[in-house]
Amino acid sequence: MAAGVIRSVCDFRLPLPSHESFLPIDLEAPEISEEEEEEEEEEEEEEEEEEVDQDQQGEGSQGCGPDSQSSGVVPQDPSSPETPMQLLRFSELISGDIQRYFGRKDTGQDPDAQDIYADSQPASCSARDLYYADLVCLAQDGPPEDEEAAEFRMHLPGGPEGQVHRLGHRGDRVPPLGPLAELFDYGLRQFSRPRISACRRLRLERKYSHITPMTQRKLPPSFWKEPVPNPLGLLHVGTPDFSDLLASWSAEGGSELQSGGTQGLEGTQLAEV
């Protein structure tokens, strides 16, 4: 009985359960043909191209203001070959402006131009030469002059001897020194640009032969010593010792007076003869 009850499953011929997918039916990808896929890809590419064109047009309208639209200049990529040429042209333009405003100018190009290098002294001149040249100019109540202005010095033949007239850049005549002209001509003859004539030099040397130049005077050592600072300052009542200096000056003064007296006697004797 039990054997008859128990039968194999095959005898009942039951339908086998089918294995269904875990995904719902709606989410399953539908089958698409190759033609439809190509059409969809073409549509997507066209949409992307349209979006890129719209973005470029929007950037151009925002970046280009009224100045750029009026000039018609289109912004270029820094990596383009025209960018270095523009930089070179800009640098040449700037250097030209600098040379035009700050460089040396010619009066023919600009009548109001002033050469700042015109008043410069040559490097070959020593400090002593420049000092004495300025001293002469200040004594003549005129500004320091350069080599070109020094060439305009001239001795008037009709005027008295020793009166030197000077012409500046504009032809202005500076008043003469008068009696001091001979002293400056004799004392600064080696530093003055226009050399005096030989006869005039001999006459000046003969006239001032009794005067001992400062470089040839025998001054005492105390003359060349710098003063020592006194701790008491102005309260010190002691006077410095100038005895050796006064002695040397008195000796030189006596010799000069004696030479002047002998010259005066000789002059009177010649006048009497």
Curated annotation (Swiss-Prot):
Residues 28-56 have a biased composition (Acidic residues). Residues 67-83 have a biased composition (Polar residues). Specifically expressed in the stomach, pancreas and intestine. In gastrointestinal tissue, expression is primarily restricted to gastric G cells and duodenal enteroendocrine cells (EECs). Coiled coil: none annotated. GO terms for biological process: digestive tract morphogenesis; enteroendocrine cell differentiation. Keywords: Developmental protein. The keyword Lipid metabolism does not apply. It comes from the Eukaryota. Disruption phenotype: Mice were born at the expected Mendelian frequency and do not show gross phenotypes at birth. within the first days of life, mice however display reduced size, low body weight and substantially decreased survival. Examination of fecal pellets and internal organs reveal abnormal digestive-tract function, as well as changes in the composition of the intestinal microbiome. Defects are caused by impaired expression of gastrointestinal peptide hormones and development of enteroendocrine cells (EECs). It holds the Pfam family TEADIR3. Residues 18-84, 253-273 are annotated as: Disordered. Plays a critical role in intestinal function by promoting the development of enteroendocrine cells (EECs) of the gastrointestinal tract and pancreas. It is thereby required for normal enteroendocrine peptide hormone secretion. This is Protein PERCC1.
